[in-house]
Curated annotation (Swiss-Prot):
One of its GO terms (cellular component) is cytoplasm. The lineage of its organism: Bacteria, Pseudomonadati, Pseudomonadota, Alphaproteobacteria, Hyphomicrobiales. It comes from Methylocella silvestris (strain DSM 15510 / CIP 108128 / LMG 27833 / NCIMB 13906 / BL2). This is Elongation factor Ts. InterPro entries: EF-Ts_dimer_sf, Transl_elong_EFTs/EF1B, Transl_elong_EFTs/EF1B_dimer, Transl_elong_Ts_CS, UBA-like_sf. GO terms for molecular function: translation elongation factor activity.
């Protein structure tokens, strides 16, 4: 069994909103497994967490670049937030995104080996910035969205400069319709994605393991019900889950689209666009998601509630 630490309790609290002692008990009951502890809390009705989430801990920037019908998002990490405000680092992240979109690269290693303006490779440009700024930097990931016809919309949240920030989104609308209609629609959807953080475009795109996990939680929460009743409860619960995590089923956050799902908003735009519109794909990067930093400032609260030790 893994030893339960203060950092683990803090992490679980941030992911679930549950009380400290509930988090401690959950971790003890699940052998220190964070994901199992999340499910344990949900089954006990102590957490509202509905989907897997990663704590935002790394620093750096997410960069977005769009060229005609192609868009990319890249994440470049640094050691401190201070570097994210450095103009050289910002130029580096922005240029890497431009290289990726111009060359159509979605593999990190291929992007590192790509030509960087000035005669070096992307990897060499990063190394040069490390030497100049004096802080380690990493090209962590890159992803793209492309459409044959239509538009790719973008949105950057907490922007520190054009196309650079803490959350970056690109979304593709496949259509032969009027770009004057499609472009603002794509941006509104990108903004929605940044705020609502969907896991997939639609239910069929969800990881089967995520769906199976949700079914298990619903079944455990309603254990003891007759099989026929339980089946309906699980089915209803999954529909609610899909509305929370599938883009086309999510209620739009925009006041102009009140009581409409994103799927309905896109469908209704077809008349103004003059052609069918397909929501093809999206990418949402939040800076540092899935990367953990060690924490050492939680001891006081633990000491007060658990006599100094977990």
């Amino acid at each position: 069994m893994a030893s339960v630490t203060a950092a683990m309790v803090k992490d679980l609290r941030e992911k679930t909103g549950a009380g400290m002692m509930d988090c401690k008990n959950a971790l003890n009951e699940t052998g220190g497994d964070i994901e199992a502890a999340i499910d344990w809390l949900r089954k006990k009705g102590l957490s509202k967490a509905a989907k897997k989430s990663g704590r935002i801990a790394a620093e750096g920037l997410v960069a977005v670049a769009v060229h005609e019908t192609d868009g990319v998002v890249v994440e470049v990490n640094s050691e401190t937030d201070f570097v994210a405000r450095n103009e050289e680092f910002q130029a580096l992240a922005r240029t890497i995104a431009l290289v990726a979109v111009e060359k159509g690269l979605t593999d990190v290693e291929a992007l590192k080996g790509a030509h960087y303006p000035g005669g070096s490779t992307v990897a060499e440009a990063i190394a040069n910035s490390v030497a100049t700024i004096g802080e380690n930097m990493t090209l962590r990931r890159v992803a793209a969205v492309n459409v044959a016809q239509g538009v790719v919309g973008q949105y950057v949240h907490n922007a520190v400069a054009d196309g650079l920030g803490k959350i970056g989104v690109i979304v593709g609308l496949e259509s032969t319709g009027d770009a004057v209609v499609l472009a603002p629609l794509a941006r509104l959807i990108a903004l929605h994605i940044a705020a609502a953080s969907p896991l997939a475009l639609e239910a069929a795109d969800l990881d089967p393991a995520v769906v199976a996990r949700e079914k298990a939680v619903l079944a455990d929460k309603n254990a003891g019900k007759p099989p026929q009743v339980l089946e309906k409860i699980v089915e209803s619960g999954l529909k609610t889950f899909y509305k929370e995590v599938c883009l086309v089923d999510q209620p739009s956050i925009h006041a102009d689209h009140a009581n409409k799902t994103i799927g309905q908003v896109v469908k209704e735009a077809e008349k103004a666009a003059g052609a069918p519109v397909k929501l093809k794909a999206f990418v949402r990067y939040a800076l540092g998601e899935g990367i953990e930093k060690q924490e050492s400032d939680f001891a006081a609260e633990v000491a007060a509630a658990a006599s100094g030790q977990l």
